[in-house]
């Protein structure tokens, strides 16, 4: 059994958090032991700095808290926890929730409607999530609610609103915008050809640049084999920004599994 270095109690009365069990979700199994250790260290600090607030009867236990923290910290594994500054609370509903939405049309009329949301992220406010979709974020399917909302937070570090361009050097902005819009157009063309439900990338990515960055961040971490070959130039930009290469990580994990299987006697 691995003796995890993070299992250090803050006091004699505190029970060690179940980090090893929390790491057992499919999304995190490709991480090396060194990466897992680094991720847990970030997640421990995350839980010290942020407040998880269960709503509408949702029950939050230590395992759920650990897994939520791990998913929040995965995108900033190499960037650093300071990239998640600017909010202090995560509100968690048991299921998708209803909100009042107000929007203005092209002629200036203001409309109000109630819509169902999976999550929300405010620039200087809390992140709102729901547990059903968090659970669906544990696998490697291309869907990850927490990474989506974290991407919006990373996006807004570059200005007053999410633009689809995170905080990168000015000389890289034009190339980023070009590749992101090319990806949006490609996704839209597929939608027009096969329909939203049959599209290989979530159709929400074609709605605007901010959502494209957030959706493709989900695929970057949880389905790199779909993202990388389809948008290779944009993939390299994501690798450079996040300072991670999930596809290389996946290939290494698969090679390790294959080697282990061939050496079983």
Swiss-Prot record:
InterPro entries, sorted: MetalloPept_cat_dom_sf, MtfA_enterob, MtfA_fam, MtfA_N
Cofactor note text: Binds 1 zinc ion per subunit.
Alphabetized CDD domains for the sequence: Peptidase_M90_mtfA
Cofactor(s) annotated in UniProt: Zn(2+)
Classification via SUPFAM superfamilies: Metalloproteases ('zincins'), catalytic domain
A GO molecular function held by the record: aminopeptidase activity
Subcellular location: Cytoplasm
GO terms of biological process kind: proteolysis
Pfam families: Peptidase_M90
GO cellular component, one term: cytosol
UniProt: Zn(2+) binding residues: 111, 148, 152, 211
Keywords for this protein: Aminopeptidase, Cytoplasm, Hydrolase, Metal-binding, Metalloprotease, Protease, Zinc
Keyword Oxidoreductase: no
EC number: 3.4.11.-
Superkingdom assignment: Bacteria
Protein family per UniProt: Belongs to the MtfA family.
Assembly behavior: Interacts with Mlc.
Purpose: Involved in the modulation of the activity of the glucose-phosphotransferase system (glucose-PTS). Interacts with the transcriptional repressor Mlc, preventing its interaction with DNA and leading to the modulation of expression of genes regulated by Mlc, including ptsG, which encodes the PTS system glucose-specific EIICB component.
Name assigned to this protein: Mlc titration factor A
């Amino acid at each position: 059994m691995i003796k995890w270095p993070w299992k250090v109690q803050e006091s004699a009365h505190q029970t060690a958090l179940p980090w090893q069990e929390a790491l057992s979700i499919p999304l995190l199994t490709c991480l090396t032991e060194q990466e897992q250790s680094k991720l847990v260290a970030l997640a421990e600090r995350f839980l010290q700095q942020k407040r998880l607030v269960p709503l509408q009867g949702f029950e939050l236990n230590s395992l759920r808290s650990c897994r939520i923290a791990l998913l929040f910290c995965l995108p900033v594994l190499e960037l650093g926890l300071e990239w998640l500054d600017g909010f202090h609370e995560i509100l968690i509903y048991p299921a998708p929730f209803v909100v009042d939405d107000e929007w203005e049309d092209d002629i200036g009329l203001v409309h109000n409607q109630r819509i169902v949301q999976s999550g929300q992220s405010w620039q200087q406010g809390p992140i709102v999530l729901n547990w059903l979709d968090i659970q669906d974020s544990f696998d490697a399917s291309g869907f990850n609610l927490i990474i989506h909302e974290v991407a919006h937070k990373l996006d807004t570090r570059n200005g007053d609103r999410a633009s689809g361009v995170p905080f990168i050097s000015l000389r890289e902005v034009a190339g980023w915008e070009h590749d992101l819009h090319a990806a949006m157009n490609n996704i839209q063309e597929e939608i027009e050809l096969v329909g939203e439900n049959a599209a290989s990338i979530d159709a929400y990515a074609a709605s605007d640049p901010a959502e494209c960055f957030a959706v493709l961040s989900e695929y970057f971490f949880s389905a790199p084999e779909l993202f990388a070959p389809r948008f290779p130039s944009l993939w390299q930009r994501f690798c450079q920004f996040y300072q991670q290469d999930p596809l290389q990580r996946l290939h290494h994990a698969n090679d390790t599994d294959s080697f282990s299987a061939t050496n079983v006697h």
